[in-house]
């Protein structure tokens, strides 16, 4: 999809389904390269545990972005490239595991729309805030969404410059 073509249609958000995983993996590879490519099994497990927090963005029938989120406790960040075994019994936060937009659709508001959907889910679930791990080049976007850096170590695999961020629920 060309930039002009992607700009012509406003993205439509819908719940993510298991049969969307091949398209999700293609966007993940285009967005991050091979270094952060997670398997369909890892992403499918997150989808199975928290389907209400996983969304897909489409434009003109093509997939242009996605977000995987899930309830999470106070313990930093979940490991990358490892399937979640279970969700915490008491979820203090909504955790944005991955939000990616196809390169052709960047700058069109897709990321903000996807984040808005999971923010509404997390706020509605009564979480006291949201957390995520931001890659260095995404930090400005997350700061604009109200996130601040939380000092501390991350599990291996998140890469140089990645940091844990948190956003408190707004009244």
Predicted regions and their residues:
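Conserved active-site alpha-helix within GNAT-family acetyltransferase domains
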Residues: 112, 124, 136-160
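Conserved acetyl-CoA-binding loop-helix of GNAT-fold acetyltransferases
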Residues: 101, 107-120
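Conserved GNAT acetyl-CoA-binding A-motif
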Residues: 115, 120-135
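Active-site rim helix/loop that mediates acceptor-substrate recognition in acyltransferases
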Residues: 33-59, 68-86
């Amino acid at each position: 999809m060309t930039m002009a073509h992607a700009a012509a249609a406003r993205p439509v958000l819908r719940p993510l389904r298991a049969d969307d995983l091949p398209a999700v993996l293609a966007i993940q590879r285009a967005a991050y390269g091979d270094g952060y490519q997670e398997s369909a099994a890892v992403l499918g497990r997150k989808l199975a545990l928290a389907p209400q927090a996983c969304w897909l963005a489409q434009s003109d029938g093509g997939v242009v972005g996605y977000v995987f989120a899930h309830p999470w406790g106070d313990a930093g960040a979940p490991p990358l490239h490892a399937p979640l075994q279970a969700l915490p019994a008491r979820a203090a936060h909504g955790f944005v595991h991955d939000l990616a937009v196809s390169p052709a659709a960047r700058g069109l508001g897709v990321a903000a729309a996807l984040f808005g959907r999971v923010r509404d889910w997390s706020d509605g679930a009564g979480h006291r805030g949201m957390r995520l791990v931001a890659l260095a080049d995404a930090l400005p976007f997350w700061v604009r969404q109200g996130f601040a850096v939380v000092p501390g170590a991350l599990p291996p695999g998140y890469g140089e410059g990645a940091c844990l961020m948190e956003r408190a629920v707004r009244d």
